[in-house]
Amino acid sequence: MAARFPTNHSQLAQAHSTAPDPEISEASSDKHSPAPINEKNNVIPGEKEELTEADCYDELGYSFPVWKKWTILTIIFIVQTSMNFNTSLYSNATMGISEAYGVSEQAARAGAAVFLILYAFGCELWAPWSEEFGRWPILQLSLGLVNIWQIPVALAPNFGTIIAFRALGGLSSAGGSVTLGMIADIFESDQQQYAVAYIVFSSVGGSILGPVIGGFVEANLKWQWCIWIQLIFGVATQALHAVFVPETRTTVMLNNIAKKRRKSGQNPNIYGPDEITPFRERFSIKEVFITWMRPFKMFLTEPIVLTLSLLSGFSDALIFMFIQSFMLVYKQWDFGTVEIGLSFLPILVGYFIAWFAFIPAIRRNIAERKAKPEDEHAQYESRLWLLLFTAPCLPIGLMGFAWTCGGPPIHWIGSSIFAAIVGIANYSIYMATIDYMICAYGPYSASATGGNGWSRDFLAGVLTVPATPYFTNIGGQKHLQDASTILACISFVLVIAVYVIYWKGPVLRKRSPFAQHLASARNESTGRRASLFPGPGYGSHPGSRGASRMGSRSVSYTGGKGQGGGAMGAKQQDYVRRKLEEVNKEERGEKTE
């Protein structure tokens, strides 16, 4: 039955004052009914009904046929690849930019760095608006702006113009915060891991596609073609998205369905969730600021988020440092521009190996969670199981690369093999940390994973410019080996955190203020499994919004206990919303009741 909302403030106050507590029985709550019900239509006269997911589940993204879901996902795969392709292809233009504008190659690399750094912030800035206005218009706007900013970069009259519009391009990129959200729009919580693994591959793979193609471009065309190719790819991607990807955001779909039902006369009192509450109440400036700041707050105050984000960010930053260092390494074997670009393919091979390894690992994880629905370790830390074996590939790969990258008489294939091992680690770390944090933080998973994504892009951007001086100036004659050895030692320390969290995760989560509130809500809302915990949503399914008015934000990719999805009762939804409201009030500095 659709939820009913008063149409004026006095009725709203009355409804609020008489709202039933989860502990109160149905019989006792009935006496608070503000008006008689029309039995024929089950509608309270003069009131609006809110359309919930349970009322039209078959019309939402979760009920799309499998072929349609994976068609949408494949286009989102291309979108994510395009975004990351833009971050890396520019590096092949640095020599041409240096010659054209009379700046050093080191200065020219600032165009890559500023794009990545602003990309880190852009992902966080775009995500809340995709939840408010829908995924489709926000991605179209993002893709369109990025494409527009490519033109002045290619036609730049001076170097400053390149930097300015590369910065705008990075800031305009919506990134993984929106694409991961789309997974949650069309897949239930027990079906999302395979889809996430697919999109994670597009994210890391797009970064490698840049230098592979860039080698051919740099060798045969002017530097501007590194930008024009980004534009061509971007326009084609935007067209595919515009034509073949429908709106998937649950609340927006509910609004549209409600409008159709009113227009057809099926139910003149039905309204979508965003139609019930005015925009200003849902998205005040203060609430938007709180939403934007939450990922950074969690990054600094949550040990799990900080540790796993640093590990993930460091491994990704290595890839962008590699882009700068591979030229130094493989020139020792007289590799040309094209061959240096192709030397990145082993990393891509590593990504494929890791992706395929996760398929049986996900199947194993699902079986374990089903077999032990009340075991916290099985529900949470078991998601890191494969990472116990693949995370050591990071220091192993770096150390092996360090002592096989010294040039002849050592064969170049040795360093390529170890580069592939680093690729296995990079993919595995990103996939496993995203999966774990989403499960651990539930409705705040967007903020938790936002910190992860932010650290990956920000650290990659910050380390892009000093990468070449680092590899050339560290140590003496064996400077390449010494520089990579230092990176291997740093990665060894970070990888230890995986084992600490795997074994001590329950203890760390109990010390987390966010996780404590969520655990309390899970345990007290009639003992329902966490997979039925609605997060910030109307209804029980990922992607819906229940706490949007409170400034709560979610990618809505959930992965809590249990495997099912089902409608949570109105009283349980009410209770969980109040628990989330307590967290949000604390963030705003308000007293909780």
Positions of the model-derived regions?
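Flexible cytoplasmic loops linking transmembrane helices in multi-pass membrane transporters
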Residues: 42-71, 249-322, 371-393, 574-593
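Cytoplasmic helix-loop-helix junction between adjacent transmembrane helices
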Residues: 165-204
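Cytosolic juxtamembrane N-terminal segment immediately preceding the first transmembrane helix
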Residues: 1-86, 99, 532, 537, ...
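Extracytoplasmic
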Residues: 68-105, 126, 175-176, 322-327, ...
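C-terminal transmembrane bundle
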Residues: 84, 113-116, 120-123, 154, ...
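Helix-breaking motifs and short loop linkers at transmembrane-helix boundaries and internal kinks
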Residues: 86, 101-102, 133-134, 155-161, ...
